[in-house]
Amino acid sequence: MKIAYLGKIQLSDVDLSYLHEAQKLADVDYIMEVNPRFLKGPAFNIGKIYPKSGLFKAVDIYPEMIRLQGQIDLERFYILNTCGRFWLFKSFVTNILLLVFLIRGKYTRIHLAWPPHVYELVLYFLSRKMLLTVHDPFPHTGNDSAIVRFRRKIAFRLIPRLIILNRKQRQDFLDFYRLSPERVIDSQLSCYTYLRSVASDEASFGISGRYILFAGKISRYKGLDYLLPAMKRVHRECPDCRLIVAGGGKFHFDTTEYETLDFIEIRNRFIPDDEMVALIKNCAFMVCPYTDATQSGVIMSAFAFNKPVIATNVGGLPEMVKDRHYGLIIKEKDVDALAESIVSLWRDPELTASFSEEIRRDYSTGEKSWRHIAALLFKEYA
């Protein structure tokens, strides 16, 4: 069996974690797109794009990729590189090169991590061999657009098998897109084990003391407009409780009143892997106060270091954060519920320690491990 895995830099943490196990089971080639729009992601921070367009072995054009040795097979790691002022137009050409590569490779299956962009539509020539992981059965608030809907509609119509990562939204997904049940494969995320290979030093990033963490790209649906007011209430009961907000993106509300508070620190920028790992490893627990969701890579990053999570009762989050086992599930859009849950965990280190132990036990082996998930997906590849 020979598999081509077409990943995205913005999903590289989950891709690398999955491929670490998948490449043990068969020949899996990893092909990742790099262009001026996509140079940074959870596992990559490419400072300068290679000045030629084409399909290359990753280490041949980005020698720094050698750091992934031991995580994935570097001989099977390729970069689809598109550069220059008119990169968007050049992408149509580089994707033709990718199509030729896939045809010559005679792959059994082609696994896509994201619905193809307009400049990738040529890849549908091989649609009969494709599977697609649908990370978001429904677009997040603020991330929907006509072009996104178009890409999803084409993908769901042409790609024979679709993989979803939570069961709660399965029936709604089938009904909304009018899909036959046999086309949709149930799977799940495991913790982002790739992050464990990242060296980090908390002293280098100004990390000290006890704190809780919100991490990830700033988006409207992430619920920071509920978390920041909640922290004012938390501070009245637990003056020593600090929140660090770490992630790039634009706030959709005015944060001026929170920027001067000594118990809230906002790092509103791209957070490289080593800093993110240091922040997660040293926090007491993480908070995901999302107003809508499918599943969450942030939660899987927390679980890589056995950190409990407070999450809201939206989308597939309750499947990921088993209430009172891996953390707490609370009502969404509720400042009081957020404040009460934060105070509860902050005051009870023994409870957070017990949650951490359950995460470590359940995600190391068994049905929540990447080994188990990869084995099940390979049955679908066959």
Predicted regions and their residues:
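A conserved mid-protein helix/loop that constitutes part of the nucleotide-sugar donor-binding site
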Residues: 13-17, 219-233, 300, 336
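A short, well-ordered alpha-helix in the C-terminal region of glycosyltransferases
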Residues: 337, 344, 351-366, 376
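Conserved acidic donor-binding segment of nucleotide-sugar-dependent glycosyltransferases
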Residues: 266, 323-324, 328-335, 344-350
